[in-house]
Amino acid sequence: MTTNPAFELVVRRHGTSVLRMCTALLGPGPDAQDAWSETFLAALRAYPALAAGANIEAWLITIARHKAIDILRANHPVPMDELPESAVLPERTGQLEMLDSLASLSELQRKVIGYHYLLGFPYADIPAFLGGNPASLRRAAADGIKAMRSQHHEAEEES
């Protein structure tokens, strides 16, 4: 029977990749560090119930993404009926648009883009996490990036 490693070892082994994901979504600074801390706090609470042999890194990255989204939403400005004359767009608007674009992709596209572009895994290693083959995963990522670019261009044309 396999058991999961001690949680301290999990933090040491996966802490860097979780911080990289948080920083990619929130930018460097205290928000990314808060998301990292909240990720491992939530993971510590849920760790005893995690199935033995589960993909711990993928599980942690999912938690980190949710925590980053929570922080972005908490920092999102409240809509007003009328904007003041000197209204300035918040610096995170682009990040929220990026998250919306990511959310519109298929689950496979989101995961492949995350593993390859955010965590730095080569396409040859990603089938170990997601199944499939490197060529199909590369295609899924390319299609996802193309869709995100298209959405970005449409948003620019509207503004």
Q: What do the predicted segments below correspond to?
A:
Residues 65, 69, 130-159:
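DNA-recognition helix of helix-turn-helix
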Residues 51-52, 61-82, 91:
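Arg/Lys-rich amphipathic alpha helix in sigma70-family domain 2
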